[in-house]
Amino acid sequence: MEPNGTVHSCCLDSIALKVTISVVLTTLIFITVAGNVVVCLAVSLNRRLRSLTNCFIVSLAATDLLLGLLVMPFSAIYQLSFKWSFGQVFCNIYTSLDVMLCTASILNLFMISLDRYCAVTDPLRYPVLVTPVRVAISLVFIWVISITLSFLSIHLGWNSRNGTRGGNDTFKCKVQVNEVYGLVDGMVTFYLPLLIMCVTYYRIFKIAREQAKRINHISSWKAATIREHKATVTLAAVMGAFIVCWFPYFTAFVYRGLRGDDAVNEVVEGIVLWLGYANSALNPILYATLNRDFRMAYQQLFHCKLASHNSHKTSLRLNNSLLSRSQSREGRWQEEKPLKLQVWSGTELTHPQGSPVRTRLSHSSCLLSLSLLSFIWKLGTWIHHRRPFQPSLHISA
């Protein structure tokens, strides 16, 4: 009985562990997809965010969104089942997508650091340095490097030790790494961008401190200290998240290339892999939420939904109140009018084809719409009392 109880306890622990891991991975996937969808939606609905500076942030969000949709779900299934069940051909496609999107995500972060470095260190020449053509070339460069290190290398077998494109074990699916591929991929994808990002963000931090000290002569010492603290926290969060998420993975990646594909424990390999994926969930927070324009766009985006809901409820209460007051003196015409008003208030929240799309809804617009509702209702009531024998005209009006 004791051995059976021990086995049962181990099984329960295993099931509980799997459930916990599945909840964590599912939550991470959801945050990655939802966060990057919000970034793309905010840029598409807010014209103020459609700038060259935000091209790299949109590219980063699109890359992380594809990673959350095309790669992370299969990685979660593979991590929980401990075997690959989708065939060797799809394994090559999956690993190629994984390497390509992770590489593109990191290179987008690298380009963002260069863009901000140019904007802070030489703001007067920034429009000359950062042009649409150069931004387009940078984006093409990101994807050329990413595709070269992923699809091209994996499908030509540049990453394997024996020249084959797939492993011998059909139930395993992970990127093979030889010495050359491990060192080249690690240097191009992570270590070289990390070094340059450290230099650029250090320069940005120094300039931010100098500006805070200059402001200190004009404003209060406390305000300058707060600005300096915010700049420090922001840059520390950006660099800290990047290093914590990706440094363990690329250390294990290069170590596998030097020592062999089985040199790293599978559990450790899975942990560092998902730690790298977590950076895609943090990017919308670090690179968008810390931006004032993006924060305003988020507020307008969510406030629009809340204001639309409140406006609809207020219009319904107004219709019901007007209906109850008019039932004692009006006939069939008053029973149809609230429906007309309700439909009209609904069209206030939609956009007919061919009209310009409203991107935000504020309290003032809600109050204006309610005022117009009240005015039209009073005007219709006045016309009805003046011309009581033409109710059909009042309804159409």
Swiss-Prot record:
Keyword Disulfide bond: yes
Glycosylation: residue positions: 4
Residues with lipidation of kind S-palmitoyl cysteine: 304
Disulphide-bonded residues: 91-173
One Gene Ontology biological process: histamine-induced gastric acid secretion
GO-annotated cellular components: plasma membrane
Membrane topology type: Multi-pass membrane protein
Transmembrane parts of this sequence: 23-44, 58-81, 93-114, 135-159, 180-203, 234-257, 267-288
Superkingdom: Eukaryota
Residues marked Essential for tiotidine binding and implicated in histamine binding (site): 185
Keywords tagged on the record: Cell membrane, Disulfide bond, G-protein coupled receptor, Glycoprotein, Lipoprotein, Membrane, Palmitate, Receptor, Transducer, Transmembrane, Transmembrane helix
Statement: the UniProt record of this protein carries the keyword Transferase: no
CDD domains according to UniProt: 7tmA_Histamine_H2R (cd15051)
Family according to the record: Belongs to the G-protein coupled receptor 1 family.
UniProt cross-references to PANTHER family, sorted A to Z: 5-HYDROXYTRYPTAMINE RECEPTOR, HISTAMINE H2 RECEPTOR
Record's protein name: Histamine H2 receptor
